[in-house]
Amino acid sequence: NFLLDTNKYVNKALKYSGLSDDLANKIITCNSTYTVRFGVRLRGQIYTFEGWRSVHSEHMEPTKGGIRFDMDTHAEEVEALAALMSYKCAIINVPYGGSKGGLKIDPSQWESRELEKITRRFAQELIKRDLISPSMNVPAPDIGTSSKEMAWIADEYRKIHPADINGSACVTGKPPSKNGLVGREEATGRGVQYIVREFFRNPDLLKLVKLDNDLSTKSFILQGLGNVGYHLS
């Protein structure tokens, strides 16, 4: 269980933090998880979809975290991923809380125009609950989503909130032609590249793991070839 595993490792780390048990429990606890179910008329019938948006911590706002489209996603997975977003941001002092979203869907089973209708309906459900908002909750691409879906979501937000001058900031990962940033697509994989580079430049860390700094003699295992793995490789 992904959520139990996440909490187990965090609990293990918190033992060394000196925090009180009640504060440690509050840090681990997810603030809220919203389940939304909505219908979309497609192919002559109404299909019902289920999705989630979890907010782990609002100690900093907006909260930040991707939206994935995946048949295997579920509420507990989304909660675990939201928690990891909180921890990642806190560890490196990025001023965001943690959030995550998921829609139980196989994107490959739908044509682009159908996927757009589904994405926009999901966005509407989240927007009206302030679960997509430039100042409160900002999604990004994840498994099964890309800059295309982010552009649809941003457009839907601007339709619902036309007076919000920061409307385009309701999601990150948009195409550069839709107010997105050049280089964002490869940014995460590039970040891993820099981490590995700096690791091998640090003699103290290399000594701890009994490695030398000659990268030409090293091999590695890459788990997955999604956005991060592709650009890293």
PLM regions: where:
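N-terminal Rossmann-fold NAD(P) dinucleotide-binding loop
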Residues: 229-230
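Glycine/serine-rich phosphate-binding loop and adjoining beta1-alpha1 elements at the start
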Residues: 70, 89-216
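Conserved hydrophobic helix-helix packing surfaces used for dimerization/oligomerization
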Residues: 218-220
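Residues that form generic nucleotide/phosphate-binding pockets
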Residues: 9-16, 26, 81, 125, ...
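Glycine-rich, N-terminal phosphate-binding loop and its surrounding beta-alpha-beta segment
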Residues: 25, 35-107
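Short, Gly/Pro- and small/polar-rich lid/capping loops
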Residues: 1-35
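Glycine-rich Rossmann-fold phosphate-binding loop(s) that bind the pyrophosphate
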Residues: 224-225
